[in-house]
C-alpha cells in the first residue's frame, strides 16, 4: 500500500477528550473517529487491526471444533422475558418498539437467542455436543462511556455457546475452550492470565476471566510466575495450568498460599470471560434433550466471550511507548513501514520500488511511504502507527545499495547490504 493513496488522518497532539494511552493513540494514529458518545467509526488502519484479531480468534475457535453462525444484533424481547433476564440489564439494554408494537432490543449478549435456536433444532443426545459461535456487534447503553473503545457503548464480541448432555461432558468442553483461549492469546502475541471470577448476570457454576497484563490495567491480578511460560510452551496439560494460582484482588487470599509458590502481581485488563452456566437457560426456556434412556433432560450450557474491539485497545495499553504503538507482528496492520526519505533521489526511488515489490511478492503487508514530507515527520508517523519493523532508505546508504532495518520495539537498526544478501534472508522473523 502506498501511503500517498492511503487514508491515514494522523494527529500531532493528544486529543483533549482522551484520558488513557490507547484512546489517545487510536485517535492520533487515525484508527478511529468518534461519532457519538461511546460510538466510533473504524478507519482503514484500525479496521485492519480489528480484522486481524478477528481472524486469529476465528481460527482458534474453528480449531477447537466450534461452528460459526451469525445471529442478529436486534433481538425480540420475548426471549429475554422467557429466560428471566429482561430486567437484569436495566437501562444499559437499549429497547424499542417496531411499527407493530413488538418490543425489540439491541443485544448485549446472546444466551437467550442461541438457546432458542438450539431447542427448536436439536432434540437427541446423539446430536451432542455442539459448540456454536458468532462474531457480532453489541450495544450497551453505558451511563458514562469512556476510554475510547475500551469502554464504549458499541463493541465487537466473539461469543461461543456450548451444549452438552451432562455435567461431565460440559466440564470437558469448558476445559477445551479454556485451552483454546490460552492458544488464542498466545497467537495474538499477548500475555494473558486466566483468573477465577464471578458469573454475574450470565449465571452459572464456574467462571474464568482472561486479563492482559498491562501497567495501565484497571484490575490488580495475583498469579503464579509459571503463567509466563505459556507463550513458549503451549502444550502444558490443562489440569496443570488450572492448578496454578491466579486471582483478581477481590478473590486474592495470601493466607492460603504455601511459601513455595512464586506469586507476582500486576495490573490487568479483562478481555475475555468464560462461564459454565449449567441448566439456567435450558430450564427457563424448556431446552430439553432426549437422553440415551429416552428421558427429557435440560441441556448443560456454557458461554465464552472475547471482546475483539476491546482487545485492540488492551493490546495498545500493553504495547506502546512515548512515540506510539508497538504492534505484535500477528495483529499489526502493516508488518513493515518502508520509508523513502527522499523521493526526488533517483537511487532512493529505485531501491524503494525494488524493496516494495520484493515485499509484495512475499505477501508481506507493507506501507510504503512515498510522500514528499521531511524525514522527521515520516519517522514520527511510522513510530506512531507502530509497524513492528521499518525499512529506511536514505540517499547516502542507498548509493551503495544499503537500506536500514529498524526494530520498532527495541530501536535496534541493522544495515542490509543488498549487494551481498537477498532481502528475504533478513526477514526470517516472519517465519518464526
Swiss-Prot record:
BP term (GO), one: prolyl-tRNA aminoacylation
Pfam families listed in its UniProt record: HGTP_anticodon (PF03129), tRNA-synt_2b (PF00587)
Keyword entries, A-Z: Aminoacyl-tRNA synthetase, ATP-binding, Cytoplasm, Ligase, Nucleotide-binding, Protein biosynthesis
Subcellular location: Cytoplasm
UniProt GO cellular component terms: cytosol
NCBIfam families: PRK12325.1, proS_fam_II
Similarity comment text for this entry: Belongs to the class-II aminoacyl-tRNA synthetase family. ProS type 2 subfamily.
Protein name: Proline--tRNA ligase
Organism, scientific name: Rickettsia bellii (strain OSU 85-389)
Lineage: Bacteria, Pseudomonadati, Pseudomonadota, Alphaproteobacteria, Rickettsiales
